[in-house]
Regions:
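Proteolytic cleavage junctions
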Residues: 1-230
Length: 230
């Protein structure tokens, strides 16, 4: 993604589809129109263009929005009091929030209005956890692995650290400070898979060099870092 937003809880794809012609009953006989729509569906653009007009000619300010509602998973950590929903723009390869209004979340049910019929997602800042207020490593109680502890800066975490036990080729969430993540507690996964699962839950720890610009820090010089580690 080319901006700082990342999806959490998965992606919802919204399509507007045509319905096949309805059957008619005439004198006890059911008549069905045979057309490609009888065995297939057709995706429509939104707003539906007037016959002979192009979609680009429609003033989106006057397009009635669609209201969508669905439940989000229980294992999502929401870092913002007001949730944000975005749609995926293929042209710019980024999540965008324009065209989405009236976002609300009640009892895990997400509701919003939109004029964008495409891929939607609940989104958060990819750098919400950065920079860390502190981090450390220590041996585990058995001495066979290492505990990596990071404390996110965001107030949502209340200064509580996220701890990951790192072993030979696998790692697992080792702290239960965040109730929404308890389903991952003690589950051994490859490092990349665990980081991906945490990111999907709303705790993004796999930051990249491009994310430095969003938190106002300079990225490491690779050559200097390598020299200092030798």
């Amino acid at each position: 993604c080319n901006n700082e937003l990342t999806s959490v809880g998965g992606v919802c794809t919204v399509d507007l589809l045509t319905l096949p012609p309805l059957p008619k009953v005439v004198q006890g006989t059911t008549l069905r129109t045979m057309s490609p729509l009888a065995v297939d569906v057709e995706r429509l653009p939104y707003p539906i263009p007037v016959a002979g007009a192009e979609t680009t000619e429609v003033d989106m300010a006057y397009v009635p929005p669609l209201m969508l509602s669905y439940e989000i998973p229980d294992d999502i950590v929401l870092v913002d009091e007001t949730p944000s929903v975005a749609w995926w723009d293929d042209d710019s390869s980024e999540w965008k929030t324009d065209g989405i209004t009236d976002v609300s979340l009640k009892d895990r049910t997400l509701t919003y209005s939109t004029v964008k019929v495409t891929h939607h997602a609940l989104v958060q800042s990819r750098v919400a956890c950065a920079p860390y207020t502190r981090w450390s490593t220590r041996p585990s109680s058995t001495g066979e692995s290492v505990i990596v502890s990071v404390t996110p800066k965001h107030e949502r975490f209340g200064g509580r650290p996220i701890e990951i036990e790192v072993g030979e080729g696998v790692c697992a969430l080792a702290s239960d400070a965040e109730p929404a993540l308890r389903s991952l507690l003690g589950v051994k996964l490859a490092p990349r898979k665990l980081l991906a699962r945490l990111s999907k839950c709303g705790v993004h720890l796999a930051l990249e060099d491009k994310d430095c610009a969003y938190v106002g820090i300079e990225k490491k010089d690779a050559a200097l870092e390598a020299a200092m580690c030798e």
